[in-house]
Amino acid sequence: MTPELAHDLKASVRSIPDYPKPGIVFRDITTLLGDPRAFRRAVDELVQPWAGSKVDKVAGIEARGFIIGGAVAHQVSSGFVPIRKKGKLPHTCVSMEYALEYGTDHIEIHVDAVKPGERVILVDDLIATGGTAEGAIKLLRQLGAEVVAACFIVDLPDLGGAAKIRAMGVPVRTLIEFGGH
């Protein structure tokens, strides 16, 4: 990715200080999603390493991962798999508890969402501590998927999430970084 593109994408993300609590700067990608040129460029850049490769499914983490993941799935001509909060999917699911900053939560996937051996790219808008992505990768692997990559528009490297995912043996692709929380 060119430095100019990284600059443009970073400029298209709104920063909201002291949200959701004092001392946190929330990185709001809805401004990037609302800019057709920035959104297109971000999706094109996310999928670039897999152009021409076999990708069976793209899995997106609720909620912004659905938006980005759907666009990525379209670009790589694959199916899309939603990973949702507990109780939101209508069919039989497998569930995974994952760590939050303070406590735990659960995510789910339909039991038939991926087949053993399918090549899956995991997508979300942002990676911070990596807890949700880690849980999603464990769910996909539980169903027999090969998670070939995890892709995020924004990385908060100070929180260590991308490093955690790489330690699981999953390549991580991020487009832009913001320091701090």
UniProtKB/Swiss-Prot annotation:
Its main location: cytoplasm. It is found in: Cytoplasm. GO terms for biological process: adenine salvage; AMP salvage; purine ribonucleoside salvage. One of its GO terms (cellular component) is cytoplasm. Its EC number is 2.4.2.7. GO terms for molecular function: adenine binding; adenine phosphoribosyltransferase activity; AMP binding. Pfam families: Pribosyltran. Keywords: Cytoplasm, Glycosyltransferase, Purine salvage, Transferase. InterPro entries: Ade_phspho_trans, PRibTrfase_dom, PRTase-like, UPRTase/APRTase. It catalyses: AMP + diphosphate = 5-phospho-alpha-D-ribose 1-diphosphate + adenine. CDD domains: PRTases_typeI. Catalyzes a salvage reaction resulting in the formation of AMP, that is energically less costly than de novo synthesis. Homodimer. NCBIfam families: apt, PRK02304.1-3, PRK02304.1-5. This is Adenine phosphoribosyltransferase. It comes from Rhodopseudomonas palustris (strain BisB5). The gene is apt.
